[in-house]
Every structure is written in structure tokens, then in C-alpha cells.
From Swiss-Prot:
Keyword Protein biosynthesis: yes
Role description: Catalyzes the attachment of serine to tRNA(Ser). Is also able to aminoacylate tRNA(Sec) with serine, to form the misacylated tRNA L-seryl-tRNA(Sec), which will be further converted into selenocysteinyl-tRNA(Sec).
Disulfide bond annotation, renumbered to this chain: none
Record note on domains: Consists of two distinct domains, a catalytic core and a N-terminal extension that is involved in tRNA binding.
Name of the protein in question: Serine--tRNA ligase
Residue spans crossing the bilayer: none
Pfam families documented for this protein: Seryl_tRNA_N (PF02403), tRNA-synt_2b (PF00587)
Cellular compartments annotated: Cytoplasm
Protein family: Belongs to the class-II aminoacyl-tRNA synthetase family. Type-1 seryl-tRNA synthetase subfamily.
Length: 424
């Protein structure tokens, strides 16, 4: 959420930023209009309350002077004023509800260093690591390899749940768990994160504070009875962990790593990545999350991104880092790096992690503050990143580590977790 005062004082700057993101700018005019109406109503209510208070004092004075008839007239006026106040307060609530909703619909402002562009085609490649493997045989796509080895069952998953679900079997299911444990061990032991296992169901307030609502309502699974939401990412739970709290300066940065399944309706992705495990309604992810100060958040993004990269490096999976342009930024992000891993079946790089600095966007939505060295209250800056998407990491291993005789070699770092060197 953006600061209302900042919007009021810098409407043109905000509009220019929204234009760079390919967003409509009329919402800023609506916000300013609601804000002006709100301030006008507040002034009217304040004036009437002052008049009512003055009348109360006058009534007491008149009664002391035995002027009961005059006092009764003032009392009647007071009741009329109270009714006016009640009506204006009702109008004020409606205006404030509309204003707050509009504020929740405004995306974050891109950082000054973000490349300007319309869509993913104008993202900027920052660096590459590793070299795609040159096969001396025709590599198989993970969906074919997994089916032939009786490790992936798409048909029975569809029978159970419909499209975009997968059953993992045998050693490939164990490899999924090995990846999760490997990532958690790396981030806690080497990178200093605190491990969290959060709830998968959260309240509307929680998922609103992270930025998923109201914009992504159609992409979320929701319970009809209790109005609870299944998380689309552990970022939702971690961003709400300290909602309505004030953190001490010396406690920052707070660094959390969480493992959860993630649930997404993928409402806008019809026809995309229809085969295999790349785009699923349910998938496992290890999430990295920081709470820090405005002074440290830019450098924190570089550090968080390097932590996600380390997973790929230790697994010896070729990847590239891409800086997202303004038109491809996520709703809550001020700056984002995507990590894209090489997949032979696509003969291309595919996203496996998205690392973002949201600045005070989530802190303001969740009312999460900290006391600085001068004991002043400020909103925290938050950062998030996949460390990594487990299913896509599994896919990358299957495709990049496959052998000519149809087996899957296990990366060296995962052998201690698996107790074997090959699957198949």
C-alpha cells in the first residue's frame, strides 16, 4: 500500500510510475477525490461536534439560571446536531471504505533502477552461471522420463483432482523431500535463516496485507464456510507473521525460511505449460523472507538473491539472473530478480525463483513498524524470494541429470539425503 499523503502530494509522479507498469492511472484521481470528500466530511463533523459541545455548556448555564425553556430549545437543537453528525459519520464510513479499497488496488512503485519496459520481452539479463549440458543422445522431457520410469503419474492425478496435478511415486517422491531438506539445511545453517512451518489456511486480513487481495482474488482457493484462503505462497504467511506489531531495531533483520505447499487456481494461464509439472495447482516451495530497514533493503535483495542462487550452484544447474522491467513487475514488488534454470525440454531458461524487494508496501498494509535509533516509528521493508520452487528444481534435475540408459543421476549434494547415486 502506498502512503496516502504521498499520493496526495505527488499525484503526477505516481501516475507516471503506473504508466511504466502498464496500469491505468484513473485510480489516482479517484483516490484523490475520495480523500478530498473524506477531509471535507471530517471538517463538517468536527465543526458540528464543537457546536454540540458548546451547546451542552450553554444548557448547563441556562439551567443554572432557571431558564429552562431556553435550555430546552438548545437541547432540541443538540438532538438535531447529533442526528446530522450520525448521518455524516455514515457517509464518512462509506467514503473511507471506498478510499481504502482503492488504495489496496494500487501496485507498488518501481524502484528507480528498474529497467523500463512493457512486458517480459524487455526484461534485462544480468548474468549467467554454468553452461547448458550438451547431450550425446536425445534428452527426454521430464513428463516422458518420469512416466517411463513409473515415477510420475499424471493420469491418476487427473482422476483424483483434475488437470494440473501430479502424483510423485517412489524415489522421485523421496527426491522431492530430499530437495526440501537440502534447501532448509542450506538456508538455516549457512545463510542464517529461522525455519518456519506456517499454516496453509489464512484469514482475509492476512492475505490482504501481503498484497494478494483484492487483485488476485480469482487466482486463490477459498473456503466458502469460514472465508479462509489457501496460501498461494509462504510469502503470505511470513508477511503476516508480525502484522500489527512493532519490532525493535536491534532485532532486524529478521530472516525466515519456510516450506509449504502452494495452491493456485492459475486462472489466467489457460493453455500455458499444459504438459508436465511446470505449472501446477499445487506445488512445493521453500520461501525466503526478510524484515529489515529502508537503509538496508536494497543490499538485502542482493543477498537474498545470492542465497537462492547458491541452491542452483550447489546442484550444478545452469541458470541466469534476469532483472524484471517495469511492465513485468509483480503487484507488490518495487524491484525483482528472476532466476531462470535451463530446461532441455524447452531448450530455454524457465523461472525457478523470483526475488523481490517490496520496500514498505507490505509493512504499511500489515501495519508492521520498527523503532529506529531515535526511537521513531517507521514501517519495515520486506523482501521475499523462492529458495527454490521445489517441483521445478526436481524437473531441472530430471532433465539435466538424465543418462543415456534412461536413468536419473542424483546430484552430489543430494546423495547423503537419498543414500544412492541413481534413480531408475
Amino acid at each position: 500500500m502506498l502512503d496516502l499523503k504521498y499520493i496526495r502530494e505527488n499525484p503526477q509522479e505516481i501516475k507516471e510510475a503506473l504508466t511504466k507498469r502498464n496500469n491505468e492511472t484513473s485510480i489516482i484521481d479517484e483516490i484523490i477525490s475520495f480523500d478530498e470528500e473524506r477531509r471535507k466530511l471530517l471538517q463538517q463533523i468536527e465543526t458540528l461536534r464543537a457546536q454540540r459541545n458548546q451547546n451542552s455548556k450553554l444548557v448547563a448555564k441556562l439551567k443554572a439560571q432557571k431558564k429552562n425553556d431556553e435550555a430546552e430549545e438548545i437541547i432540541i437543537q443538540g438532538k438535531e446536531i447529533s442526528e446530522q453528525i450520525k448521518n455524516l459519520e455514515s457517509d464518512l464510513k462509506n467514503i473511507e471504505d471506498n478510499l481504502n479499497y482503492k488504495l489496496l488496488c494500487v501496485p507498488n512503485i518501481p524502484d528507480s533502477g528498474v529497467p523500463v519496459g512493457k512486458d517480459e520481452n524487455e526484461n534485462l539479463e544480468v548474468r549467467r552461471w554454468g553452461k547448458p549440458r550438451e547431450f550425446d543422445f536425445e534428452p527426454k522431457a521430464h513428463w516422458d522420463l518420469g512416466t517411463e520410469l513409473n515415477l510420475l503419474d499424471f493420469d491418476r492425478a487427473a482422476k483424483l483432482s483434475g488437470s494440473r496435478f501430479t502424483i510423485l511415486k517412489g524415489d522421485i517422491a523421496r527426491l522431492e523431500l530430499a530437495l526440501i531438506n537440502f534447501m532448509i539445511d542450506l538456508h538455516t545453517k549457512d545463510h542464517g535463516y529461522t525455519f518456519i512451518l506456517p499454516p496453509h489456511l489464512v484469514t482475509k486480513e492476512t492475505i490482504t496485507s501481503s498484497g494478494q487481495l483484492p487483485k488476485f482474488e480469482d487466482d486463490l482457493y477459498k473456503t466458502s464456510l469460514d472465508q479462509m484462503y489457501l496460501i498461494s505462497t509462504a510469502e503470505v504467511s511470513l508477511a503476516g507473521l508480525h502484522r500489527n506489531e512493532t519490532l525493535e531495531f536491534n532485532s532486524l533483520p529478521l530472516k525466515y525460511v519456510a516450506y509449504t505447499p502452494c495452491y493456485r487456481r492459475e486462472a489466467g494461464s489457460y493453455g500455458k505449460d499444459v504438459r508436465g509439472m511446470i505449472r501446477q495447482h499445487q506445488f512445493d516451495k521453500v520461501e525466503l523472507f526478510w524484515y529489515t530497514t529502508p537503509e538496508e533493503s536494497s543490499q538485502a535483495l542482493e543477498e537474498l538473491t545470492s542465497h537462492a542462487e547458491k541452491v542452483l550452484q550447489l546442484l550444478n544447474l545452469p541458470y541466469r539472473v534476469v532483472a524484471l522491467c517495469t511492465g513485468d513487475l509483480g503487484f507488490a514488488a518495487a524491484k525483482t530478480y528472476d532466476l531462470e534454470v535451463w530446461l532441455p525440454s524447452y531448450n530455454d531458461y524457465k523461472e525457478i525463483s523470483s526475488c523481490s524487494n517490496t520496500k514498505d508496501f507490505q509493512g504499511r498494509r500489515g501495519n508492521i513498524r520498527y523503532r529506529d535509533r531515535e526511537n521513531k516509528l517507521n514501517f519495515v521493508h520486506t523482501l521475499n524470494g523462492s529458495g527454490l520452487a521445489v517441483g521445478r528444481t526436481l524437473v531441472a534435475i530430471m532433465e539435466n541429470y538424465q543418462t543415456a540408459n534412461g536413468k536419473i543421476e542424483i546430484p552430489e549434494k543430494l546423495i547423503p539425503y537419498m543414500g544412492k547415486e541413481f534413480i531408475g
